[in-house]
């Protein structure tokens, strides 16, 4: 504050003193100034501080005193210190001196002489202090101590007077040069200008360097510095005679002209100095040595003035003449030849010509240009002749050509017709003069001076021809352009200059070849002109030029291929050269494309395009993608068909090579995407591709009409490419914005990914226009692509233009008559567009199923359905009504008034549709949150403003939705132009339209081509009488269409429900937890009910039980570890929807054939990878895909993990995966649960409603059915009921009652019944009557295969005529019986494709021959290369070898092309085969009468996608299937479901105790049976068991309703029945002891030992009978099975199990044996009897035997249970209960006694060859089917994982042994009519089947029972055939003598 007051006082005093000067006032001012400075003596900036500067200026008055006083000494000391520190203070100090001088003169009126004395005193002090600094400061360095001398340097240069002081200058020069060339300040100081003209060379050079770095100095700025220059100008007259001083002046002037604004020099004219006149006059002087300096000055002058140099007084031609004709220039160029300087740093005296050309109009001064080029070229040539290369002259020539070429390329595109002659003249001048110069050059290597100078111009010269060629081609593509006129000169250039360039390739001059490739890349997409019927004037000239280029350049490519491999590799090491060669690969011209790809193949060491692309991406990823971006950019300039075709092909290869899920670079190498350079390259590539798509769909309609088929293929490929890119969007997004080198965890890329999505949104603008296509296949692809694009845009909240929204919306709501879009496609479009639609639009949606919309919109993760997944409801138009030759032709507008009526009608109809739920639409819009303003609008504007865009889009936009062709009448508008039936005039018209059209897609012909055609007279609208239609049972077409649409909606929801929840739940489980549902209320089980209110209630019950069952499978699999672990290494990961897909590689040799997709696996970290005890180290996952390689396995595992846990899954970490179970069945059951509400039988399922049995089963109907199908009465009733009932029909089939035969009868009845209903046929349509199709299912493969084999033998129709329906078996091949394989879909398809496979083999042979030729050519080429190298090294003439090598290379290229074509054809064939395969599969399924599958396999994708409808579904063994499995086959529109089963036999196997507890083990059959058992049809006659065996089951399990077939006692009679201890039916009371095994299952050793004795008794006593496969041992417990097998194996060895079956009860269901031994096991009085109390299990055990049943158990504990009490009491009552110990049984009767007893029997046992006779039981005795034993089959994989309670003996793979015992009983009069010969041999066929099965059977499978021609009888062996019998003999058992068996 005080400081400011002091300054204010100083200022006031100064002002007072200046107004009234006085001595006292001046002293007061000095006192105040000194005081103020003293106060601020700590401030180092006295002078540059504005306030202190005032005080300093006032203190300068101290120098006016005569003597130095103490004040002046103090002031000089402190001022000197500050002037040594601050350059700014120096400047202000000298300005203060000027101010001080002004004050002294003007204010204080000093005497000039006095003032001069004062100023001199100050000057002397300045010289003194600077001298001191220069003398005393040590050597200059970077320390602060050097600052004073640096400030001294600056002050000296700032003041020229000080600089030129005689005392200062020498001292300054020495110290300044000592310090080097210092740069003191950014601003110029006058001393620099002064030194510019100094005679001291070093200081002058320093000044020149300082001035060279300064930007242009303005007029005003330089006036401050002009003093030294003006002084030099004034002394010019003295210097003119001194050449050295003139040289110095001219050099300085030249430099100033380059850096000072021309306005300053114009101002010098007023000072009597005209720079232009001075320089031009100097060129006219006789000073030859000064000529170069004046020319340099002229260059600087022209540079400074630019076009402002020229005035009316000065013209360019005059300047040229003055120079070239001047004596000085002539003498200088003539006398100084070879004396020119080649120092490129020196001023170039020839450079003025370049500056001159930049100041004139090139196009108007071609003659002047010609003069300069001639003069310079001749001068250069003259100097070359004397052996001197004038580098400066060549530099100027290069600069001149560079300027001219640049100007030419700027002028050419904008030149009008008036300038084209001048343009042509300039073109010719440039080409001719450069070619002359080029031939003078000796370009040895890349380092030569000539090449460095001429390199850029050489590239210009190449582009000169290529640019014209490209412009001509672009003119052809766009007729609006004016063609250039000098194409002929280009043709000559290709014949001359370009041919000369071939030497460059021959001599392997890399540096020039690189430029050639780079230049030629600009025409990489130019194509030959297609033939046109209308000739174009310049066409032949263009073709000549193009052919010349192709011929020359293709020869260059051949020459390059002749190089050594190392040379070719070196060539492409340069990125720009690589881009040039790679871009030429895309060329539509075959010769260029083939030659270029051959070079890249060579350096990639591969011979296929695919391998080459892969190698390029591995080694040069960024270069490859950048090169492709360059090609895409080039295509945007030409937009031609040929280029687009190659772009799509090669870029698809690139994308596939990078992102293929199996072989892609990102899949194989997790670190591949970490380089920032790669990320940026891929981002640019992505953007370029979508920009290409945007323009592709614009220009597509403009391409020539003769390429129709090719256009179809190209558009299909392009749409597939779009689809591919959309599918990998997440991978691309992760690549670009995901992991990088420094990242350790994944980065969320959604925000950044929106930039990528915007590219897609921009392309959506043009793709949407193609919704009006008339090619259904392409239209399907367009719809799929658009829907996927919309999905991505919605996910990333990308805005879409309103125009696009309107287009898609109009297409989605267009009626069927106006578009060929199917209902499904329109629905897909509408659903995908929903987030962008308003509330009002959504409320008036034509898709009136609210549940449909809600379901689809909520399942955002679902993929869109493809067209082949939709139901086949789309109306197919007759081929005759649609032009097949023009797939894209958009039909003309319908100029019909009825159109408006239809639209209004449609609108009113839409209003009646159901509205979507408000909360659904609100949620959708909120989730999208997409602003209505669109970034896509700018693209539309840009596209519309492009002059090259055709009007096709405008016509597309204006055209109304396309109507379907009328089916009522044939219209010429839609007829095929190539149709032979059309008239000649129509052909002419079509032809002319083709000629005049811009392309295949043009709409230009709409208005004109049909304007003259008269419209057919329209019929008046007539209203139908709906009442009359109802009475006639006719459906109105509108209602029919509406019904069809609704059916389609329901079908889609039935077949493809959203199942993401299934995997979300399962994959979210912790496999180490005890339970998964403890905290989840939704997963708490509730008791199953008999009926349900709705599907939601049903789902709440069954969904938790289903997941509990899955959880039980998980826990069981984790404990058992059935499958070996697989070691994996993590590669990479990606996010898909709400899951994470992680890709692994396994190099483990572990066999992995057991893996398949949908497997649930346990993934854990390897021991070496971290803490395996961490729960997060274990995760459930699903196999998404599997790729098996020769040495490794590649897996994609899908997981449901939190993003925070992703860091646990980093690349290269080792994991272990172990398969737990296959989730296919559970997944299909979940899908069935989700689709229940949409099933036709949904309500019947919820209500457990069973259709009542028909009451009109008259005797006539009964007798007819029994006669036609050969069945008994209850079977006939069941057949009749199933054929007339809708809904559910229950057939109860107890054991042996002929269920299979009944099913065959149902099949015949359903397939041969005829529909009597009337249908309304739409006029013009032929409605095909859909034939009845049957879907037959069962829980197990064995049951299905049994039915299938019976169908194979034939089925009877309702007239009793045998026929053979078409049958298809669907399912997993390994689980299907060998004898049913021929019916599988795969086998049927293979037969259909055999012919195609032969063609493929032929193609493979051709490829092999070509490969051999190619290998031979390669060897020859390599040999020639070696010989050529030797010749060249020895200097021999190698022209012959070079010619041979070129020819060999051409052959190699042709063979390579052939191999690539073959590979492409092979790939195309494979693609076509895949399509054909799907078509054949679909056709086979469509044509099949019967489809057989397990319940799980009925949900196979093949059936889901085939669009089939099965009105009738038959489920066998329905009581053994869980309820959800029974629902799976009902999703195909089933209206009648026949369930065949037995509720008294085993229930479904369920692993989860919780699920079983709440009723999950109750089948749908049983639930319905319990509700309506009176409606079940009972098959009451059994043909399996001996009456003694069936008596108890019939009484206790079937209320005595199960009757025996006729003569069953005789049929099942056997020799051992006479043995008193054996007999037919026995209960052996064995007092054994039960025990627990390690697995908590029970076993009984005593019972096992007794059964062994019982078996020995049988085989010892009856050695003449082959018991192989006849005996089965059944027990409820698995440990007892192991105990039995152990004892039998110890006794007989492993061979025993080929003759004897030992299984659990569950494993024996469905099988039958002659003898069954049942081990009860339970012997404890306190523990109960466990599983034995299950009536169904006991029923199964007791009903497996045909002839004998032996029960082994402990009676006392068993009788605690009511059922066993009844069983044992019944046995005792019947006298079949035996209380025997093992010893008692062993010794009960000797073998001889038994033999004697048998010998006395009346049985006919005369010889061993005589069979045991028993009467046959059947409808017809002579045709009776025999008893046979089928080997068991593995059940369907779907049921492998099911089980029951923990200690029950349930096998993982339930064995099924279905037996063909469906024999029926009927009256002897009833016979099977019209039996063919094949029927008589049916048993023989089955016998052969059994034999072949035995040959392939394992040791555990049952044997085969040989049968003779007399069906039903066992055959005696000629000798003891049983190996078991032989084994018994070896242990001391002797067979009875033959005499015992002879009849007495």
UniProtKB/Swiss-Prot annotation:
Biased composition (Acidic residues): 985-996
Swiss-Prot/TrEMBL GO biological process terms: RNA 3'-end processing; termination of RNA polymerase II transcription; tRNA metabolic process
Record key words, sorted: ATP-binding, Helicase, Hydrolase, Nucleotide-binding, Nucleus
CDD domains from the UniProt entry: DEXXQc_SETX, SF1_C_Upf1
UniProt GO molecular function: ATP binding; ATP hydrolysis activity; RNA binding; RNA helicase activity; transcription termination site sequence-specific DNA binding
UniProt biased composition (Basic residues): 1912-1922
Top EC category: hydrolase
Ranges for region Disordered: 908-999, 1824-1944
GO cellular component: chromatin; nuclear body; nucleolar chromatin; nucleus; site of double-strand break
UniProt-listed Enzyme Commission number(s): 3.6.4.-
Protein name: Uncharacterized ATP-dependent helicase C29A10.10c
Biological classification of the source: Eukaryota, Fungi, Dikarya, Ascomycota, Taphrinomycotina
């Amino acid at each position: 504050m005080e400081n400011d007051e002091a300054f204010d006082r100083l200022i006031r005093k100064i002002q007072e003193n200046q107004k009234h000067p006085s001595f006292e006032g001046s002293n007061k001012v000095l006192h105040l100034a000194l005081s103020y400075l003293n106060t601020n003596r700590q401030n180092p900036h006295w002078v540059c501080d504005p306030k202190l500067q005032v005080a300093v200026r006032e203190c300068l008055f101290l120098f006016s005193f005569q003597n130095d006083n103490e004040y002046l000494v103090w002031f000089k000391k402190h001022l000197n210190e500050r002037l040594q520190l601050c350059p700014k203070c120096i400047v202000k100090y000298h300005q203060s001196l000027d101010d001080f001088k002004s004050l002294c003169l003007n204010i204080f009126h000093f005497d000039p002489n006095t003032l001069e004395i004062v100023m001199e005193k100050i000057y002397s002090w300045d010289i003194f202090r600077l001298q001191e600094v220069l003398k005393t400061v040590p050597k200059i360095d970077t320390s602060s101590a050097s600052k004073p001398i640096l400030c001294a340097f600056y002050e000296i240069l700032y003041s020229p007077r000080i600089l030129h002081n005689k005392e200062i200058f020498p001292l300054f020069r020495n110290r300044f040069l000592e310090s080097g060339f210092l740069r003191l300040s950014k601003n110029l100081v006058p001393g620099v200008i002064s030194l510019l003209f100094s005679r001291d060379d070093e200081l002058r050079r320093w000044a020149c360097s300082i001035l060279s770095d300064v930007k242009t100095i303005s007029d005003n700025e330089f006036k401050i510095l002009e003093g030294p220059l003006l002084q030099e100008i004034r002394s010019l007259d003295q210097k003119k005679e001194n050449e050295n001083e003139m040289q110095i002046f001219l050099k300085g002037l030249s430099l100033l002209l380059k850096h000072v604004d021309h306005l300053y020099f114009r101002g010098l004219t007023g000072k009597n100095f005209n720079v232009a006149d001075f320089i031009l006059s100097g060129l006219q002087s006789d000073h030859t040595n000064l000529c170069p300096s004046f020319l340099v000055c002229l260059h600087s002058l022209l540079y400074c003035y630019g076009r402002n140099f020229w005035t009316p007084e000065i013209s360019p031609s005059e300047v040229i003449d003055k120079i070239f004709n001047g004596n000085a220039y002539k003498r200088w160029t003539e006398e100084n030849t070879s004396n020119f300087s080649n120092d490129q740093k020196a001023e170039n005296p020839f450079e003025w010509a370049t500056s001159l050309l930049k100041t004139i109009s090139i196009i108007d001064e071609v003659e002047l240009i010609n003069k300069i080029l001639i003069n310079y070229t001749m001068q250069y040539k003259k100097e070359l002749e004397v052996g001197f290369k004038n580098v400066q002259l060549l530099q100027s020539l290069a600069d001149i050509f560079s300027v001219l070429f640049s100007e030419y390329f700027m002028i050419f595109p904008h030149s009008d017709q008036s300038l084209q002659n001048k343009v042509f003249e300039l073109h010719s001048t440039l080409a001719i003069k450069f070619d002359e110069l080029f031939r003078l050059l000796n370009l040895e290597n890349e380092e030569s001076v000539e090449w460095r100078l001429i390199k850029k111009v050489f590239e210009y010269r190449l582009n000169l021809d290529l640019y014209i060629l490209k412009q001509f081609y672009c003119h052809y593509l766009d007729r609006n352009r004016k063609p250039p006129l000098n194409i002929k000169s280009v043709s000559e250039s290709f014949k001359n200059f370009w041919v000369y360039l071939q030497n460059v390739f021959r001599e392997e001059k890399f540096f020039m070849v690189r430029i050639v490739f780079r230049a030629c890349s600009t025409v990489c997409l130019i194509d030959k002109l297609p033939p046109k019927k209308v000739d174009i004037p310049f066409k032949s000239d263009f073709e000549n030029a193009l052919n010349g280029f192709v011929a020359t350049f293709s020869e260059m490519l051949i020459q390059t291929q002749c190089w050594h491999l190392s040379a070719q590799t070196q060539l492409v090491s340069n990125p720009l050269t690589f881009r040039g060669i790679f871009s030429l690969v895309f060329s539509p011209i075959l010769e260029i494309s083939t030659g270029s790809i051959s070079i890249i193949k060579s350096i990639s060491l591969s011979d296929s395009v695919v391998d080459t692309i892969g190698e390029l991406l591995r080694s040069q990823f960024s270069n490859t993608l950048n090169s492709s971006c360059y090609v895409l950019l080039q295509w945007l300039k030409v937009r031609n068909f040929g280029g687009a075709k190659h772009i799509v092909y090669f870029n698809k290869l690139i994308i596939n090579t990078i992102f293929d899920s199996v072989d892609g670079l990102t899949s194989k190498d997790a670190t591949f995407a970490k380089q920032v350079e790669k990320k940026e390259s891929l981002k640019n590539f992505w953007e370029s591709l979508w920009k290409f798509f945007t323009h592709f769909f614009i220009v597509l309609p403009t391409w020539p009409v003769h390429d129709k088929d090719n256009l179809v293929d190209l558009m299909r490929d392009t749409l597939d490419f779009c689809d591919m890119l959309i599918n990998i969007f997440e991978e691309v997004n992760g690549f670009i914005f995901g992991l990088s080198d420094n990242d350790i965890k994944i980065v969320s890329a959604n925000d950044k990914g929106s930039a990528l999505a915007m590219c897609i949104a921009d392309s959506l603008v043009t793709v949407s226009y193609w919704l009006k296509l008339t090619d259904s296949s392409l239209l399907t692809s367009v719809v799929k692509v658009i829907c996927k694009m919309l999905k991505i845009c919605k996910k990333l909240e990308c805005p879409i233009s309103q125009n696009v929204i309107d287009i898609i919306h109009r297409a989605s709501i267009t009626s069927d008559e106006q578009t060929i879009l199917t209902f499904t496609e329109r629905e897909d479009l509408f659903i995908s567009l929903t987030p962008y639609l308003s509330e009002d639009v959504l409320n008036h949606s034509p898709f009136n199923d609210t549940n449909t919309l809600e379901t689809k919109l909520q399942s955002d993760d679902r993929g869109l359905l493809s067209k082949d997944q939709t139901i086949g409801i789309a109306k197919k138009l007759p081929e005759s009504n649609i032009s097949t030759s023009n797939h894209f032709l958009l039909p003309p507008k319908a100029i019909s008034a009825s159109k408006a009526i239809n639209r209004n009608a449609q609108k009113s109809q839409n209003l009646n549709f159901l509205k979507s739920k408000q909360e659904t639409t609100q949620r959708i819009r909120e989730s999208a949150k997409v602003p209505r303003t669109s970034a896509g609008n700018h693209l539309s504007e840009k596209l519309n403003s492009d002059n090259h865009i055709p009007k096709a889009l405008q016509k597309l936009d204006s055209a109304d939705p396309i109507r379907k062709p009328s089916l009522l009448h044939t219209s010429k508008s839609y007829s095929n132009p190539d149709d032979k039936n059309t008239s000649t005039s129509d052909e002419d018209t079509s032809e002319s339209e083709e000629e005049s059209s811009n392309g295949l897609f043009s709409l230009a012909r709409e208005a004109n081509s049909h304007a003259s055609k008269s419209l057919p007279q329209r019929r008046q609208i007539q209203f139908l009488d709906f009442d009359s239609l109802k009475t006639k049972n006719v459906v109105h077409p509108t209602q029919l269409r509406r019904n069809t649409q609704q059916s389609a909606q329901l079908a889609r929801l039935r077949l493809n429900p959203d199942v993401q929840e299934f995997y979300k739940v399962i994959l979210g489980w912790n496999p180490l937890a005890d339970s998964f549902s403890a905290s989840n209320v939704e997963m708490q089980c509730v008791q199953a009910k008999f009926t349900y209110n709705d599907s939601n209630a049903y789902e709440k019950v069954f969904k938790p039980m289903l997941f509990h069952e899955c959880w039980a499978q998980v826990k069981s699999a984790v404990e058992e570890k059935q499958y070996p672990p697989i070691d994996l290494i993590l590669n990479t990961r990606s996010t898909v929807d709400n899951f994470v897909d992680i890709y692994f590689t396994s190099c483990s040799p572990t066999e992995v054939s057991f893996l398949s997709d949908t497997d649930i696996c346990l993934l854990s970290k390897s021991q070496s990878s971290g803490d395996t005890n961490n729960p997060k180290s274990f995760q459930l996952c699903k196999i998404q895909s599997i790729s098996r390689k020769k040495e490794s396995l590649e897996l994609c595992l899908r997981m449901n993990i939190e993003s925070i846990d992703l860091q646990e899954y980093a690349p290269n970490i080792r994991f272990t995966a172990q398969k737990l179970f296959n989730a296919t069945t559970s997944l299909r059951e979940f899908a069935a649960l989700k689709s229940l509400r949409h099933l036709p039988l949904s309500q019947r399922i919820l209500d457990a409603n069973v259709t009542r049995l028909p009451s009109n089963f008259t005797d006539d109907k009964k007798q007819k059915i029994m006669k036609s199908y050969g069945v008994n009465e209850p079977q006939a009733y069941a057949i009749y009921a199933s054929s007339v009932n809708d809904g559910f029909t229950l057939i109860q089939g107890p054991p042996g009652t002929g269920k299979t035969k009944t099913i065959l009868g149902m099949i015949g009845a359903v397939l041969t019944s005829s529909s009597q209903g009337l249908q309304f046929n739409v006029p013009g349509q032929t409605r095909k009557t859909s034939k009845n199709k049957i879907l037959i299912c069962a829980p197990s493969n064995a049951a299905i295969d049994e039915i299938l084999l019976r169908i194979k033998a034939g089925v009877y129709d309702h007239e009793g005529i045998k026929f053979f329906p078409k049958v298809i078996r669907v399912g997993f091949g390994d689980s299907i019986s060998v004898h049913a394989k021929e019916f599988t879909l795969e086998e049927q398809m293979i037969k259909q494709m055999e012919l195609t496979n032969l063609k493929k083999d032929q193609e493979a042979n051709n490829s092999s021959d070509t490969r051999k030729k190619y290998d031979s050519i390669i060897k020859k080429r390599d040999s020639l290369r070696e010989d050529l190298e030797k010749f060249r090294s020895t200097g021999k003439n190698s022209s012959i070898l070079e010619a041979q090598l070129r020819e060999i290379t051409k052959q190699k290229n042709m063979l390579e092309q052939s191999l690539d074509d073959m590979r492409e054809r092979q790939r195309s064939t494979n693609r076509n085969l895949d399509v054909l395969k799907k078509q054949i599969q679909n056709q086979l399924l469509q044509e099949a009468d019967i489809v057989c599958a397990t319940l799980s396999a009925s949900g196979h994708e093949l059936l889901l996608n085939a669009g089939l409808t099965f009105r009738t579904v038959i489920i066998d063994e329905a009581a053994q299937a869980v309820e959800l499995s029974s629902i799976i086959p009902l999703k195909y529109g089933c209206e009648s479901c026949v369930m065949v089963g037995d509720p008294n036999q085993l229930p479904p196997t369920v692993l989860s105790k919780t699920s079983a507890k709440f009723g999950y083990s109750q089948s749908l059959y049983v639930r319905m049976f319990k509700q309506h058992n009176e409606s079940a049809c009972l098959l009451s006659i059994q043909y399996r068991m001996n009456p003694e065996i069936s008596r108890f089951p019939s009484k206790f399990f079937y209320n005595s309703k199960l009757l025996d077939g006729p003569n069953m006692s005789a049929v099942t009679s056997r020799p051992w029945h006479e043995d008193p201890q054996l007999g037919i039916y026995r209960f052996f009371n064995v007092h054994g002891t039960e025990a627990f095994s390690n697995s908590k299952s029970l076993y009984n050793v005593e019972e096992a030992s007794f059964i062994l004795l019982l078996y020995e008794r049988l085989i010892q006593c009856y050695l003449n009978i082959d018991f192989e496969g006849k005996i089965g041992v059944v027990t409820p417990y698995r440990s007892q099975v192991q105990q039995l097998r152990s004892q039998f194996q110890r006794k007989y060895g492993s061979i025993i199990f080929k003759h004897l079956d030992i299984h659990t009860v569950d494993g024996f269901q469905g099988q039958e044996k002659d003898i069954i031994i049942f081990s009860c096991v339970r012997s404890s009085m306190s523990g109960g009897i466990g599983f034995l109390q299950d009536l169904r299990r006991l029923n199964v055990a007791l009903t497996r035997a045909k002839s004998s049943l032996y029960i082994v158990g402990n009676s006392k504990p068993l009788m605690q249970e009511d059922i066993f009490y009844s069983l044992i009491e019944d046995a005792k009552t019947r006298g079949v209960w035996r209380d025997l110990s093992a010893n008692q049984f062993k010794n009960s009767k000797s073998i001889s006694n038994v033999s004697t007893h048998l010998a006395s029997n009346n049985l006919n046992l005369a010889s061993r060859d005589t069979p045991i006779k028993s009467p046959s039981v059947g409808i017809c005795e002579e045709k009776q089917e025999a008893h046979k034993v089928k080997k068991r089959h593995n059940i369907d994989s779907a049921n492998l994982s099911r089980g029951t309670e923990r200690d029950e003996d349930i096998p993982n793979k339930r064995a099924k042994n279905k037996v063909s015992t469906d024999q029926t009983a009927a009256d002897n009069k009833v016979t099977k009519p019209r039996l063919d010969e094949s029927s008589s041999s049916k048993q023989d066929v089955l016998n052969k089947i059994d034999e072949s099965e035995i040959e392939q059977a394992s040791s555990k499978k049952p044997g085969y029972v040989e049968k003779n021609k007399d069906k039903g009888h066992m055959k005696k062996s000629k000798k003891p055939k049983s190996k078991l019998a032989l084994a018994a003999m070896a242990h001391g058992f002797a067979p009875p003598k033959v005499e015992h068996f002879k009849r007495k």
